[in-house]
C-alpha cells in the first residue's frame, strides 16, 4: 500500500494542471477497481480541505461532495471513514472550521458529549455541550 499526498487529490479536483489531473484520474480508476490501494492520512485530508476552501475558494458543500466521493473509493483506506463523513456534514451544516468539525465527529463517535472550549461554535453541534473552564 502507498500513501496519497494532498497534491494528488488537489490536481484531480481542480484540474489546474490537466496533464497531472489526467494521470490522477487513472490512479483513481485503479482505486475504484481496487487494482491499486492507497492510504489517505487524516492530516492530508485536512490539508486538502484547507486548500480547497482557502486557496481555491470552493464552497463547503462542493468540498463535501468531492471528498465524499474520494473517501468512497473502495481502494482508498482512511483511518475512519465514518468519522470523516460525519465531520464533512458538520463542516457544511454548522460552518465551523474543519479541525473542529473533525474533533466533534470523533467526540460523538466515542460517546464524548462535553468539550472544554471557549469556541462558541461548538454550541451549534447537536449532542455536544461546551464547557468553559
Residues covered by each model-derived region:
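Acidic, PIN/NYN-like endoribonuclease modules and their adjacent C-terminal/linker elements
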Residues: 1, 104-105, 109-133
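Short, well-structured N-terminal submotif of metal-dependent ribonuclease cores
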Residues: 1-40, 55-62, 68
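Histidine- and aromatic-rich ligand-binding microenvironments
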Residues: 5, 40-41, 96-97, 119, ...
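Structured helix-beta-strand junction loops
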Residues: 34-35, 73, 94, 125
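Active-site neighborhoods of divalent-metal-dependent phosphate/nucleic-acid chemistry enzymes
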Residues: 75-115
